[in-house]
């Protein structure tokens, strides 16, 4: 039986190799459908790399792995997969998974058994976006996913702790990045409650995206918890990327006394309300009120860092969250 995999393979990268390795693991003979030059000219945004060159690079890689393979030209997205009786398995990326479902529909209409579909997860570059030939050709990343151009991260804030936490978080993830501070944003209220907190964080991010890779909005707000009938202070983070994907995360919450809530409801900010109860002199952005009342055991910086980290969790495994990366 035969395992089929298809693609353009303009720049043979880690994502392509993951597909090919998975095909080899099936133990079947492998048929690789390699798109023709005509197909590339019709469907790709980058300059066409000649079929012969793509064939040679693909052949040289595969021949080191197995001798049970053939490379054949295809001139459309489906290739021969809807019609070949000997095809048993198709190996696809997340981008081509829906196409494989369509291929199986056509096979069934043609009286052929559906192919077993093996979906290979995204292979992410250093910047947590999928490796692709387009990005390599554009000089954005190399074939291993190392970022060549700085990752541009925008954050809407005047708060030094939010700015520092964003820098520190990205420093743990990657080497090549720039954090751009956006101070030109509008707030609806000094102290948001409930869903208004999430809405304001989202607007902060949206007002900062522009042509950046990521935009981050962080907002602290008061959330009412019905079981205990208490109010809690949370930090909420929204991350929007250049593909339009939105992820969210929150920090741990700590209880806010009722007398503080009463003051906040009189249109005071969180800091102003606490200033009526405790001495807030000398409290900086990183320490925050939580640092004062916890005697330094927990700082506002820690809560900000936590909400950023949690907002990025879905980005570490986009397949688990069914994330797609459609170019803007």
Curated annotation (Swiss-Prot):
Catalysed reaction, written as an equation: (R)-4'-phosphopantetheine + ATP + H(+) = 3'-dephospho-CoA + diphosphate; XTP + H2O = XDP + phosphate + H(+); ITP + H2O = IDP + phosphate + H(+)
Main location: cytoplasm
Region (Phosphopantetheine adenylyltransferase): 1-152
GO biological process: coenzyme A biosynthetic process; nucleotide metabolic process; thiamine metabolic process
Gene3D superfamilies: 3.90.950.10, HUPs (3.40.50.620)
NCBIfam families given in the database record: cyt_tran_rel, PRK00777.1, PRK01170.1
Name of the molecule in the record: Bifunctional phosphopantetheine adenylyltransferase/NTP phosphatase
């Amino acid at each position: 039986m035969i395992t089929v995999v298809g693609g353009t393979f303009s720049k043979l990268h880690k994502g392509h190799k993951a597909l090919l390795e998975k095909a080899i693991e099936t133990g079947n003979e492998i048929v690789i459908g390699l798109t023709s030059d005509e197909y590339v000219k019709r469907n790709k945004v980058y300059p066409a790399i000649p079929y012969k060159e793509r064939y040679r690079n693909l052949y040289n890689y595969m021949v080191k792995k197995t001798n049970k393979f053939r490379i054949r030209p295809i001139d459309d997205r489906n290739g021969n997969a809807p019609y070949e009786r000997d095809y048993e398995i198709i190996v696809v990326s997340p981008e081509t998974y829906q196409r494989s479902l369509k291929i199986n529909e056509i096979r069934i209409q043609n009286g052929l058994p559906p192919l077993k579909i093996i979906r290979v997860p995204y292979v992410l570059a250093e910047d947590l976006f999928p490796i692709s030939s387009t990005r390599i050709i554009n000089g954005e990343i190399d074939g291993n996913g190392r970022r060549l151009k700085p990752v541009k991260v925008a954050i809407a804030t005047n708060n030094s702790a939010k700015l520092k936490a964003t820098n520190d978080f990205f420093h743990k993830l990657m080497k090549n990045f720039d954090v751009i501070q956006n101070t030109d944003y509008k707030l609806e209220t000094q102290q948001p409650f409930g869903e208004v907190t999430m809405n304001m964080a989202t607007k902060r991010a949206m007002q900062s995206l522009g042509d950046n890779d990521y935009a981050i909005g962080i907002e602290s707000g008061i959330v009412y918890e019905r079981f205990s009938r208490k109010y809690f202070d949370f930090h909420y983070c929204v991350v929007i990327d250049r593909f339009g994907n939105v992820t969210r995360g929150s920090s741990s919450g700590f209880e806010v006394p009722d007398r503080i809530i009463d003051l906040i409801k009189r249109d005071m900010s969180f800091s102003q309300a606490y200033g009526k109860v405790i001495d807030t002199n000398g409290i900086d952005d990183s320490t925050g009120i939580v640092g004062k009342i916890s005697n330094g055991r927990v700082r506002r910086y820690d809560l900000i860092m936590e909400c950023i980290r949690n907002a990025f969790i879905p980005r570490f495994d986009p397949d688990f969250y069914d994330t797609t990366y459609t170019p803007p």
